[in-house]
Regions:
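Secondary-structure boundary elements
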Residues: 47-53, 108-114, 151, 163-173, ...
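A short aromatic-anchored loop/beta-hairpin motif
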Residues: 2-112
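Flexible, glycine/proline-enriched loop segments at strand-loop-helix junctions
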Residues: 88-96, 145-152, 229
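Internal, conserved structured core segments that host functional sites
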Residues: 102-156, 161
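Short, basic/glycine-rich phosphate-binding loops at helix/coil junctions
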Residues: 22-23, 80-85, 134-142, 220
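Short glycine-enriched loops at secondary-structure junctions
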Residues: 60-64, 74-75, 122-130, 178
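Beta-strand elements within well-structured catalytic alpha/beta cores of enzymes
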Residues: 20-24, 54-59, 144, 165-178, ...
Length: 275
């Protein structure tokens, strides 16, 4: 692709006011079909920002060796879970894709190598939250995978290259959970909002303080921040989408938290809006 081709792609998205960026704590797949305070928070977030021209989602559930971007015209709805009710498997979110946006994102991320993908689709980290925000499924959605061979700092820096998409009305969403330790779930309080082990509460408080203070380096270097963060992030898959949201923040922009609750002992639903 040459610069002329990229210019033609870019012209498909009219310049508009800078779109905010979100990190959404997606929690259980059941949030896709339940009515609770968290899905209400997702809906409210959508009402507080301009309607996007398209959505680029970085989901915890597309965790790959290397970086890929969905480039099909009609991504399938992926039910990447098991042991849930049939009602959840019946959910379809038929949003269109956007191959042109996929190519532009890949071009912006150079010299990182980003391969176009035509097999993945929309996993539940994407559709389970976006369906509440935009139930009409009339906004194109693409996904960018997370390269699990790279450290948090790499993902934070990579995100900065996507900044110009914000100026074109593209909503960039990181979808995961800051505190996410499925092995230590408190099954007696699996649906109890506010239920959290002491270490989970400490990890949430630490990260919240760093977030609101704009002090992102300790968040990036979470492995150096003590026992509570080690328990909160036993594997980085659900944590790394936050790096993309934070990497897109301008110094002067405001950051706000919402859905800021622990649930089930070892999960946080804390979500972030920038801009």
């Amino acid at each position: 692709m040459n610069l002329h081709d990229l210019q033609n792609i870019s012209e498909n998205f009219q310049s508009t006011q800078r779109m905010p960026v979100l990190f959404l704590g997606h929690g259980s797949p059941m949030n896709a079909i339940e009515e609770n305070q968290f899905v209400q928070g997702f809906r409210k977030a959508a009402t507080e920002i301009p309607k996007p021209n398209a959505i680029l989602c970085i989901s915890a559930h597309w965790y790959t060796p290397g970086t890929f971007v969905t480039a099909m015209k009609m991504p399938k709805t992926i039910h990447d879970f098991y042991g849930f009710p049939k009602e959840l498997f019946d959910v379809q979110y038929p949003a269109p894709g956007n191959p042109e946006l996929a190519r532009e994102a890949a071009e912006l991320l150079l010299p990182a190598e980003v391969e176009e993908d035509h097999n993945w689709g929309l996993d539940h980290g994407a559709w389970s939250v976006i369906k509440h925000m935009y139930p009409e499924a009339d906004i194109p959605v693409i996904q960018l995978s997370i390269d699990y061979t790279k450290p948090p700092q790499y993902h934070y820096d990579l995100a900065k290259k996507l900044h110009r998409l914000r100026e074109k009305g593209i909503l960039i969403i990181g979808s995961g959970n800051i505190v996410h330790n499925l092995r230590l779930i408190d099954w007696k309080n699996i649906n109890t909002v506010g239920a959290g082990w002491d270490w989970a509460a400490e990890a949430r408080e630490k990260t919240n303080n760093w977030l609101v203070d704009g002090n992102f380096q300790p968040i990036i270097d979470y492995q150096k921040q003590g026992t509570s963060l080690q328990y909160a992030v036993p594997t980085p898959d659900h944590y790394l989408p936050l790096m993309y949201t934070l990497g897109l923040k301008d110094q002067s922009e405001e950051l706000a938290l919402f859905n800021d609750e622990l649930i089930g002992g070892s999960l946080s639903m804390t979500s972030v809006r920038i801009g």
